[in-house]
Each structure stands twice: as C-alpha cells, then as structure tokens.
Amino acid sequence: MPVDAWIREEIEIPEGVEVTVEGNTVKVKGPKGELQRELKYPGVQIFTEDGKVVIYKEFPRKKDVAIVRTFKAHINNMIKGVTEGFKYRLKVVYSHFPMTVKVQGDEVVIENFLGEKNPRRAKILPGVTVKVKGSEIEVEGIDKEAVGQTAANIEQATRITKWDRRVFQDGIYIVEKAGKPIKF
C-alpha cells in the first residue's frame, strides 16, 4: 500500500556550487572539486528547479520513502564534500613495540607493528590524501565514502585477533570522524 500520494524532498543548492542532473547521474561541482554519482531507482525522479535539487516519487511505499531520503542524504554529502570536505583523524597507539607509519604511493605502510618483520599495508582510495604527523594520521578528501573507507582500511590493517585486547592495545584507531569525536 502506498504511504502517500507522493513524496518530494528538496535540497537547497548553496552559492558557489553547481548541480547538474543527466539521466540518473548527479554531478556536483564546487570550490574543492567535482563529484558524480549514479542514483537510480525505478520511479524516482531527480531534477533541478529554482536553485534546488528535487527528488520525487509518486505513490511511494515505505521502501520508496527510504530510498528517496537516502538519495537526499547522498546529495547533501556530495554538496558538503565539494564545499567543506571531510576529515578523519586517527591515533597511533603503542606500548610494547614502537611502530612507524608512512605513506608510500597509494598505500600506508605500518612497520614494526607488534615487532613483526613484514610491514602491514593499507590501501588509500583515489581522491584521498593521507598525512602522518607523529602519532596522528589525517585522512582528507571530498568523497565521504572514500575518506571513511581509507580510514577503515588503516584501522583494519592493525587489527589484533589472536592476542588479549586488554593487554595488547597497540594499533591505529579512529578518534574523529568528519569533525565529530568518537566516544570509547
């Protein structure tokens, strides 16, 4: 059963940002760069009118309402990315073995983690910059998903599975996600 006759979500386009919709592809261009994403779902229409992006669906069911609001969140994140960008902060923590972290090409290389001879590597996704400053790592970019996945790759590379986490707390941990501190 349809929830309503229609659902219409509108997003204001801020100054200095240009949004174009071609078919199912939404392109957002701003001062920090350009992002594009394919947003496709049967019956959902995306278009621009009067300085707004409109997402519209007739006779939506619950799932359709969720999809429309998901598309709205994706477009909002694209607009925020090209205007402000996204930044994750990670902290390098060690007590037993001093590890070194450095960026080589499109990888983060972690050496001497728990005294291991072979370095551990984490992939950096395209469009993301990683800076290592002592015991802090900054991951920045305009695509929220790429920045978040790169930070997760770095955190995952130093995951300990076989040892007691209460004793061996060495690793790299996300401490701030897109400007919001993480509570432990």
Curated annotation (Swiss-Prot):
One of its GO terms (cellular component) is cytosolic large ribosomal subunit. Keywords: Ribonucleoprotein, Ribosomal protein, RNA-binding, rRNA-binding. Transmembrane segments: none annotated. InterPro entries: Ribosomal_uL6-like, Ribosomal_uL6-like_a/b-dom_sf, Ribosomal_uL6_a/b-dom, Ribosomal_uL6_arc, Ribosomal_uL6_CS2. SUPFAM superfamilies: Ribosomal protein L6. PROSITE patterns: RIBOSOMAL_L6_2. This protein binds to the 23S rRNA, and is important in its secondary structure. It is located near the subunit interface in the base of the L7/L12 stalk, and near the tRNA binding site of the peptidyltransferase center. NCBIfam families: PRK05518.1, uL6_arch. This is Large ribosomal subunit protein uL6.
